[in-house]
């Protein structure tokens, strides 16, 4: 069974969706570790409740980001992880780390990339008068919220919507599409070849597939 590592910083709601997808067998893999860069991350409690080992790596314990990422990478190599899943990991990965695990790191971002990389995506979409928003699962490279896009899910923005309403709508889609993409990877259906995403041997379009 393939081994999955999940990196978190906060509540771990996407982590919970992935845990449940593994427990039901929807994802035919095993989460072997949950890593957090925040000691008070509630996601660590979710891991504990599911019987999943966890580790905390704090920036203050290392002389540089490079050293921290090297330590995390060495740990992941020691336990022979097949896939690294970023689930609300609010620390930018260093270039050596993304190169070391190229094609083995997935991230989910709360926008329809390439629109709205970075933070405050719901607020920015609302302020710009967008009629839709969404979420994107993509491979990770050294570019922030870059990397080949795999799958996107759209949500409507209605007149009078608040940021919180858009976020709730988007998160519900995240819990659907992230386990699905992880499933594809674990089943060897999804691959990154020369910085492009392929599913079942077919090159995905630049914005990935649209989840319906």
PLM feature segments, named:
Residues 32, 82, 103:
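Conserved acidic residues
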Residues 36-37, 65-66, 79-95:
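N-terminal glycine-rich "phosphate-gripper" loop used for MgATP/nucleotide binding
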Residues 50-51, 101:
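Short, structured coil segments at secondary-structure junctions
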């Amino acid at each position: 069974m393939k081994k999955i590592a999940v990196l978190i910083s906060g509540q771990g709601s996407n982590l919970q969706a992935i845990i449940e997808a593994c427990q039901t067998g929807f994802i035919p893999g095993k989460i072997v570790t949950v890593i957090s860069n925040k000691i008070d991350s509630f996601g660590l409690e979710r891991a504990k409740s599911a019987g999943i080992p966890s580790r905390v790596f704090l920036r203050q314990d290392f002389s540089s980001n490079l050293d921290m990422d090297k330590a995390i990478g060495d740990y992941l190599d020691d336990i022979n992880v097949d896939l690294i899943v970023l689930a609300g990991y609010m620390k930018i990965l260093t270039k050596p780390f993304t190169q070391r695990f190229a094609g083995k790191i997935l991230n989910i971002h709360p926008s329809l990339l390439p629109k709205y990389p970075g933070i405050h995506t719901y607020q920015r979409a609302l302020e710009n008068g967008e009629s839709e928003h969404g979420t994107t699962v993509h491979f990770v490279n050294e570019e922030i919220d870059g990397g080949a896009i795999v799958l996107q899910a759209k949500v409507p923005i209605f007149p009078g919507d608040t940021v919180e309403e858009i976020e709730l709508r988007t998160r519900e889609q995240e819990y659907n599409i992230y386990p699905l993409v992880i499933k594809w990877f674990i089943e060897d259906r999804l691959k990154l070849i020369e910085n492009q995403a392929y599913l079942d041997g077919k090159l995905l379009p630049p914005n990935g597939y649209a989840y319906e």
